[in-house]
Amino acid sequence: MSKEIAKKRIEELRDLLNTFNYQYHVLDNPSVSDAEYDRNMQELIKLEAENPEFMSEDSPSVRVGGTVLDIFEKVTHKSPMLSLGNAFNEGDLRDFDRRVRQGIDDVNVRYICELKIDGLAVSLHYEKGRFIQGATRGDGVTGEDITQNLKTIKAIPLRLNEEVTLEARGEAYMPKRSFVKLNEEKEQNGEDVFANPRNAAAGSIRQLDPKIAAKRNLSMFVYGLANVEEKTILSHSESLDFLGELGFKTNPNRRTCETIEEVIAYVEEWQEKRPHLDYEIDGIVIKVDDVALQESLGTTAKSPRWAIAYKFPAEEVVTRLTGIELSVGRTGVVTPTAELEPVRVAGTIVRRASLHNEDLIREKDIRIGDYVVVKKAGDIIPEVVNVIFDKRTGEEEEYHMPTHCPACESELVRLEEEVALRCINPTCPAQIREGLIHFVSRNAMNIDGLGERVITQLFEADYIRTFADLYSLTKEQLLQLERFGEKSATNLVKAIENSKENSLERLLFGLGIRHVGAKAARTFAEHFETMDALVKATEEELKAINEIGEKMAQSVVTYFDNEDVLELLQQFKEYGVNMTYKGMKIADLQNVESYFAGKTVVLTGKLEVMGRSEAKKKIEALGGKVTGSVSKSTDLVVAGEAAGSKLAQAEKHNVEVWNEERFLQELNK
């Protein structure tokens, strides 16, 4: 390829990938599959490596993470990043309104209200449309240069739609679903978990290695324009519209209000809606919308007079810790869980809360009988925040983690660089039981009627010890179990038999190979197509697949380099369990008669087995149309986890709703 052709192709790929990033991370309306995005990205990386003279700082390829830094350089903000004054109740808001009106001689004032994202405040500097520097807020005057880490956040444009010089400010955050996934991975690996999404975002942004930040799935909302050359902005709402036109991601839930009563109504509305968002908010920001009035009101040394932050009441309650229970996960990690006197937190009754590991119990000096403060991290996971030491009577009991596994009495170990205690006995009954529960779960073999209770019964009756044992179960054995009759036993035997026909990716995920989630299992299944081919794959062959890292590749090779595993696979073959990939690839979907042909579909929430971009591509290949909002013309809503407000819209317009399982069934017909 000539240099001229290479340069042209590099420019084409950059434009294409920038468009894909904008559609996915800003508009939330992806137009291509993950696989197609990855192919284009790998082609760009290869061409840039072969033609380094064409490398650019605003290339989409820099989002994968660059060189490890030694330190973060200090940055002085051109204008201070001021904090906001706080309001904690309706009276505080009315006082703010009174002060504003007094300051502008009771001129009519319009407010703009925005959700207060609970993340990390940052500034973004652009020169002639190119992202040149990003910094933390720091103390408001001096922050830290985190440019390379911010480049990994795909919601931040590396090049704007206009060649304008400006400084934008916003909040980098971690979505709740990403927070839960990250902590699950850290717990499985025996690492310290993050207390909440804000800490996770801040910890990710301040990594000296940008590649770590790149893996954390951060996002960002821009909320303000600090400096802009050669453009007159008359209102804050106008500045947000302008930022959106430039390619920034702004929060869609803002509202202009003509009176303080409308502001209070907005605050009350979002206090109710808050749990349904996929990101944390800790309040509402209220600003005078008119820029001229802002300038007239001015600022104090610490904060602007024209803005205030209403802080939501803390979602924290006090209850008594009555005991500590231990559980052994399928990877052997021993996790302590607090048993609590039942208490309502964020709308649900909480009886248990994770204590994560022994170090946390010691650090917080948690004892049995203590009164503790409990909250939901990310409005999702109950956790013990701290002990109320003033309530201690002296009768509380110190807790010490055991030295041996509570399930099998094997000695517990703490692996290198792990904080968790782990049972490494491969015959530990608790690990086997948890592994069986995972094997039959929805995203794995999806055996209807075979949940945790039934697995426990089968295990305690000594009917099953391995995954393959499930396929030797008889109706007569099931009839010996509590709550099983003729019909339920027959149905379960049939469901187990039907699971033999599952596609390879479900079996792979069900095996519980360390570090291999549902998405990676699908990637392996599509790539190798048969279990035999995957078993023979080398670490180098696995690492050559997009998004498969060294740790996962090593884990897969180690797993299949085990005689017990190979014997298990042989048993699967003898029982007739399918071990080939049955899913359709996008290229195979053209001209197939499909339910989706001519239908308008909305995807919402997190899809576990395939990404929304891949789902969109497959629907379109089958003749359907995917849109970003629900209306009367919508035929179907496919709802994953944390689906949010689109479910309510579907109900309002009487639109059919499918879960991911139903969607996959139709897709694979």
Curated annotation (Swiss-Prot):
- Pfam families annotated for this entry? BRCT, DNA_ligase_aden, DNA_ligase_OB, DNA_ligase_ZBD, HHH_2, HHH_5, Nlig-Ia
Molecular function terms from GO: DNA binding; DNA ligase (NAD+) activity; metal ion binding
One cellular component term (GO) for this entry is: cytosol
Major enzyme class: ligase
Could you tell me the Gene Ontology terms of the biological process aspect for this record? DNA repair; DNA replication
Tell me the superkingdom of the source.
Bacteria
Annotated NAD(+) binding lies at D34, A35, E36, Y37, D38, S83, L84, E114, R137, E171, K287, K311
Coiled-coil-forming residues are none
Catalytic residue positions? K116
What is the protein's given name? DNA ligase
